[in-house]
Swiss-Prot record:
Protein name listed in UniProt: Elongation factor P
Subcellular location: Cytoplasm
PANTHER family hit by this protein: ELONGATION FACTOR P (PTHR30053), ELONGATION FACTOR P (EF-P) FAMILY PROTEIN (PTHR30053:SF12)
Lineage: Bacteria, Pseudomonadati, Pseudomonadota, Gammaproteobacteria, Candidatus Palibaumannia
Gene expressing this chain: efp
N6-(3,6-diaminohexanoyl)-5-hydroxylysine PTM sites in chain numbering: 34
Length: 189
């Protein structure tokens, strides 16, 4: 069992707290005028991915390291219940349930490289790449001269997600989208 001391805390470090894995998303070392120095840490619960807590650790405290593994795999297919990912080196399949995939299911297209976070050999989180290229299935037609406008219109992409795109984007075009913000980035040539 490995432990991290507070002076080893870094953003992205994964630790165990109350029997559950957490990731450090913010770490601030505070040395008050009086009293003992401490670390004010913001943590994201990895099982749900949504719960964020703030905790204070005294300087020199030790916390158990989480046995978390991040694996780079490619998305293969979905059978309605599980999303399947493949390791292209040894062709091993890993199945992730809807809880692990979460809202990111809308960005998964065949052969999309993803990062699967495993805890106790079970997927607890799936993270798609920051940018994906998807085809526009439907949108209002563009009008000549719309290239210099900052007005956006809704467009439905191949995965069913709806994003706002500039007026010059037409049906059938491939666009680059930021998966973290669901925002249009550029048109793919």
């Amino acid at each position: 069992m490995h432990f991290y001391r507070t002076n080893e805390f870094r953003v992205g470090l994964k630790i165990m707290l109350n029997g559950e894995p957490y990731a450090i998303i913010e770490n601030e070392f505070v040395k008050p005028g009086k009293g003992q120095p401490f670390n004010r840490v913001r943590l994201r619960q990895l099982l749900s991915g949504k719960k964020i807590i703030e905790k204070i650790f005294k300087s020199g405290d030790a916390v158990e390291a989480a046995d978390i593994i991040d694996r780079h795999l490619n998305y293969l297919y979905n059978n309605g219940e599980f999303w399947y990912f493949i390791n292209n080196q040894n062709y091993e399949l890993v199945a992730a349930d809807a809880k692990a995939v979460g809202d990111y299911a809308k960005w998964l297209v065949k052969q999309t490289p993803c990062v699967l976070t495993l805890w106790k050999d079970q997927p607890i989180a799936v993270v798609p790449p920051n940018f994906v290229e998807l085809e526009v299935l439907s949108t209002d037609p563009g009008i000549k001269g719309d290239a210099i406008s900052s007005i956006y219109k809704p467009a439905t992409l191949t995965t069913g997600v709806i994003v706002k795109v500039p007026l010059f984007i037409n049906k059938g075009e491939i666009i680059k989208v930021d998966t973290r913000t669901s925002m249009y980035i550029s048109r793919v040539k």
